[in-house]
Curated annotation (Swiss-Prot):
It is found in: Cytoplasm. One of its GO terms (molecular function) is ATP-dependent peptidase activity. One of its GO terms (cellular component) is endopeptidase Clp complex. The active site is at residues 99, 124. The keyword Cytoplasm applies. NCBIfam families: PRK00277.1, PRK12553.1. InterPro entries: ClpP, ClpP/crotonase-like_dom_sf, ClpP/TepA, ClpP_His_AS, ClpP_Ser_AS. The lineage of its organism: Bacteria, Bacillati, Bacillota, Bacilli, Lactobacillales. It comes from Lactococcus lactis subsp. lactis (strain IL1403) (Streptococcus lactis). Cleaves peptides in various proteins in a process that requires ATP hydrolysis. Has a chymotrypsin-like activity. Plays a major role in the degradation of misfolded proteins. Its EC number is 3.4.21.92. It holds the Pfam family CLP_protease. This is ATP-dependent Clp protease proteolytic subunit. Fourteen ClpP subunits assemble into 2 heptameric rings which stack back to back to give a disk-like structure with a central cavity, resembling the structure of eukaryotic proteasomes.
Amino acid sequence: MGYLVPTVIEQSSRGERAYDIYSRLLKDRIIMLTGPVEDGMANSIIAQLLFLDAQDNTKDIYLYVNTPGGSVSAGLAIVDTMNFIKSDVQTIVMGMAASMGTIIASSGTKGKRFMLPNAEYLIHQPMGGTGQGTQQTDMAIVAEQLLKTRKRLEQILADNSNRSLEQIHKDAERDHWMDAKETLEYGFIDEIMENNSLK
């Protein structure tokens, strides 16, 4: 079932202007990353990051994250763009950052990674499948690629936290859920945000 995107009316000297809520938030350099991470969503997030950086790369961008995760390639495209642009990217986790969402949220500018008190974090190893009727050699290729992907993602998580690569590998073996305090201790965020003190 779909949902209605709210419209915001603004008054100016030239009259009224209606914006959908996401366009209005973009004017304040706020990007909403919500729902599963997939190619279409990633392209939209990347375009918004590039637009805001081109508009003014001296101001922070605020990336609000609430996602169960999703595509590794789409998520890494977002992370690469966050690292590519000059603007600092503040990440604010609300609800949950799970799986690929953890990689994205923890890749915000160090010192500017936040989480709301009741949000959750999940790390685990990447998932993949070969499908029915896959040849044995193809299964071996997929398995090798999954191991390479896992190593790359674990290195990103280690770089974004205060944990060793070995600890990340051990913790990501199975679903590892963390509340805000545990996520702060782990080093994926820099502060638990009790109120909107970003601006």
